[in-house]
Structures are given as C-alpha cells and as structure tokens.
Amino acid sequence: FSSGFSETDTEEGRALERQLIDKLEAANFHLIGPNCMGLYNPSAGIRQNEDQYLGESGPVGFISQSGSVAIGFSMESHYQGIFINKSVSFGYGIVLDSSDFLEYFGRDPGIKAIGMYLEGIKNGGRFMSVLRDVASRKPVVIWRGGRTEAGGRAIASHTGSLASSRNTWDSAIRQCGAIQVSSVEELIDTLKALLFLPPVRGNRVAIAGGPGGQRCERP
C-alpha cells in the first residue's frame, strides 16, 4: 500500500525504490506494487475492499494501475452481472508490471475476457508483443488514462508512469487487435457485449441513433 518512491520525483524516493528493487532481486522475490491495492479473487476469499463480493468467480480478469479504479470496476461490474475471476491493482509495478499480469491472465483458462486500466507502460516492446499474443486468443479491452496534458501530469505524480502520445498509442493498440474504450462505463458495456452476444463476422453492421450530434461525435 505504500507510496513515496520514484513517483515523488525526489532523490530520496528514487534511492528508496532502488534499495527495494535490489533487495527483491537478491531474494528472487516478486512484488505487486508499490502504491496499489493488490489482488482480488472472489472464489479464494481475497479482496481489496470489504465491500467487494466474495463467492463464485466469473469469466473476467481485470488489470489496473489504479487501486480505486480496480475496486470501482469490480463493484460496478458485479452490480451489472459481470463477475470477476481475478483482478489486480499493481500501482507502478517495480517488479511485476502490466505485461506480466496480461501474460498470466492470457494463460488462465478461467478468464475469457480481460479488461485493463493503464496509465503508462514501461517496456513498450514487450507489452505490445504480449498484447498481440493474448488478443489473438481472447478479447482485451483497454481504458488508458492521461490522454490529455493535465491527465499526463496527474499520472506522473500518481504512479510515476509516462503516458505515450495519443496517436502512437492508438495505432499500436489497434495493430495488436485490442479494443480501446474511454471510461469505466464503456469498459463494462464492451465486456458485456463480448461475453453475452454472438461474435460479429464481416462488416455488415449498421448504427442507428437519435440526435445527430451524438452519432457524429466520434469517427
């Protein structure tokens, strides 16, 4: 749960983080975090918050850099009939990061769809390689924070991550076959569609709507 490492952008914080990493590497010890809420596994009785559901697990895996987003997603998705299999809040991942959890969830037979909330990635090449592999076998839906200048500054102070440019990120995610969303509501709706509706083949899709402005909001 601790913070106060490199995300503070101070010499003391960076030195403390380096000391922690050195000790972990010497002991061959894997750490989730720091600055996170850890694991949620309803069937194993492990949760991040006392209000989270415990019991039968579902088909969704969720990976989040933000603890509050991880908790909020698990509770709202449960209210809407989407049950979590496993969820992890990993903070700024000084040992295990988004690529590690995505690779693990991709191999988990109990997880049929994966949702992610990311603020930045440390090793872009490895992340894209893992994402391409996992997305070829099961759907991956990604909500990325920090898509504005102010959001990027907030992320740097929150998890110490650097958000890449929007165009670069969008292009890379599209090439890997993942689905992008822009809110937790859209994330849940997309996962519901993927889990409960038959797959759409080809391009025979029509969109009907009321107000013209809302239909023209995005390309």
Predicted regions: what is each one?
Residues 1-219:
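Catalytic-core regions of core metabolic enzymes
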